[in-house]
Each structure stands twice: as structure tokens, then as C-alpha cells.
């Protein structure tokens, strides 16, 4: 055998192996094997469609949902879930903010018109700051705004993006996207420089480089961070193919999970937030908690109330996702979801109320607050000016209703049913018709509850949730709206008075 030939073959094999190794190293961010996690998310395509994927399989094409309710020719540029309510928000190209139903695709504009200053650029991205419940907007020209998610207006115009001369930010995301978060960090993705940045401080717009993505991304990116573990994911277009990438927030490295279906270009990623509800504890603190795991709570004192006043009722306004509260001095308040600050509605004149415990819930079809009490009071209140209409006293007999909730708890609802809990008879009633105050028995709760309770119905799930105190134990219950049966879930650390569930749940 020719030994010279063997040496040549071995040399060629070595060089071929080294070339393959170097090529593999160069493409590591795209080809590395990853342990995929089970994580559902919404993806926004470049043609105004929502697609629900799971991170462990984005190659299979789900049924797309067309986004409707927009202005003529308008496109949704970016989407994100609001941690304080669980609702999906979208940014329109006409400088409008929308709440979008992820199941139907129906978009509802917030505010009377486009916000000002308008979007400056051909692309823009949004993400919620969970510590202050405001939307960060950054455009490809460096515009840097804070938006109010309840009014759809610009809250503050912040400093233009700076610190990286050639950077063109395409996607942003905050860490710790949970209601009541006390800390958060804002990260930016720039497909022009193919880098991950930290925007620090966010209001100044200063970019601090974290590291290279390790891929050559083009076009518009989508980016979001999961609430459970701060896992970060981005939709990036690489080699003309849109794919889901996991982003290392420490190094900036992008690792390909999988490509999205062929001919699908994804420009936005939104990971659902954790379920959230709000209540009031015995010390008159504002409490945020997950109704499925309520032992962990975020507690803040209410501010802006009258001396010695307590909040005795809570509910979210379906029209705009704003939280309202009823004070023990019979005043109506709006409540800041991030801080617990209360602001009186209207002239602050006391409502014509009597009683000790109250039901307090929005009728979504007419945008009015129903307030009822254990003394039989039955009111309709305008949430804009606090003016009340007195309806028929609760009947028959002398019921002791201490909680109330309407079904179809979302803006634009055309029908709704009002349910009441009587803590004296421990029965769920249907109030029908509501204005007449007539109670129709649905069925027994099956537990002996006190008047210290709260009740709400999820705007998306349609599930009845209640916080009930039975004996000395306070727990979260689900309420069967057909039979009245209360099914116990997890225990609470302490009893809560009043309850409002995030509209996205």
C-alpha cells in the first residue's frame, strides 16, 4: 500500500474534520441542541394575524386568527400581555393602542383617537413595565415613550435611544412580568447590529451592550420574557426564515428552537402572564395574588382615602381595565393597580348606601356599577361621575347579599347575568331583573360562609371565583353558576374583603 497516499488521506480527513468543527462553532447559535420547554405563546404575523404556538413545537402551523376592528389599512406592529390584568394589548400603526381578544382576534381601541406624539418610525415595539403598569414603546428611529394602558395615551415622552450609535431597536422586553413586581430590567434586541442590549435607565434610553446574538438577523424581531422563570424568547428572521430563538439574557446569545412554518413571518411574541386577582385584607391593605396559588401575595397600603376609611368593594371596568373601589364612607374611587393609590370619582359626594357588607360589580353591557348591600340596597352608579340611580330593594323577604358578579365580563358584551351570594342563607342567587332587585335561587353553596367575602367572574374563562371565610379559614373557591356549589381551592393567608379578577382570566 502507498504510505504517502495514506498520509494524504489522513491529512485531508483531519482538515475536513476541522472545517466541519469550525463551521459548527460558527453556527452554534442556530444549530445547538436544546431541551425545549412547554410554553404557550401568541405570535403576531406580518399580515395582522395571531397564531398560538407552543415553544416545544413551532414548526406545525396552527389555525391563524385574523385581527379585526382596526382602522382601514392599519397594521398591528407589536403585542404584549398586561401583567396587571392578563389582557393582550396591541400597538396599531395609526398610533392607537388596542386590547385584543386572542381567541376571536377582535381588537378594541382605547381612547378617542390616536395618541400624541405619534409613532415616529416604520416599526415600533411595546412591552409592559410590571412595576408601574405602563407600556414602554420604542421605535426604530429611537423614539422612547411610556403609554397609559387604561387611556391609550402617552404618559411620558422619554429620552431618545442612545449609547449605541448604529443601533436600531426592533424589540423590547421586561423581566419579572408579574403583577406587583418590585424590580424589573428592560432588554432590547437590535437586528442591525445583531446585539442584545440592556436599556438602563429605561427612561433615559441609554443602551448598554450585553453581547452578540450570534446570528445575522434581518427585518423586524419579536421578543418577550416568561413570568415563571424569566426565560426569554425572540422571533428572528435569519437567512430569510422566521424562527423561534431562546435568548440568553446574560450573554445575548440566540439559540434556535425551531423555524416557524414556511412562508410565515413572525414580528411579535407575547407570552401569557400569570392569573391575577385583587382583594382587601383586614388591615385595609391592597392585596394582589394568583387565585390558583394565593399564599404568595403582594401587599400595599391604600392611599388617598378619607381618614379611617376602608375599601369594601372592588371591580375592574371592562371598558378600559381600570380598577374601581367602594369606600366605607360611601365614596367611589379609581385605584392604581401598581401602587394602590385611590382617586375619588366625580365630586366625591357619598352614595345613598346603608349596610355593612356590599356587592360591587360592573355591568359590561351598559358600563355601570351595580352596588348592593346586606341591607337590601340596590344601586346603579355611573363610573365617570359617581352619580347613582336607586333601583328596587332586594326581594323577596330580607336577603343578606354580600357579594355580586356579572357574566360576560368584557367590553362589548351584549348580554349578561347578575349573580349574588347571600352569606346568611349560603345560597347563590340570580338577580333577575337586576333593576327590580328580584332574587331567584340557583342553589346552595354547600359551605357556611361569613359576610367577609368577595366574588367575581372571569372575563375570559367565565369561571366564578370567590374568596370565602368558612369558620376561621379563608380560601379561594370556584362557584358553579348552574348549581351554586362552591368548590374549595387553595387557602388564603388571611381573610379578604372584596375580590376582583384580572379581565384576561
Predicted segments, located by residue:
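N-terminal segment immediately downstream of the Sec signal-peptide cleavage site
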Residues: 34-68, 74-76, 85, 253, ...
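Bacterial Sec-dependent N-terminal signal peptides
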Residues: 15-41
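Structural motif
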Residues: 47-53, 96-101, 143-148, 193-200, ...
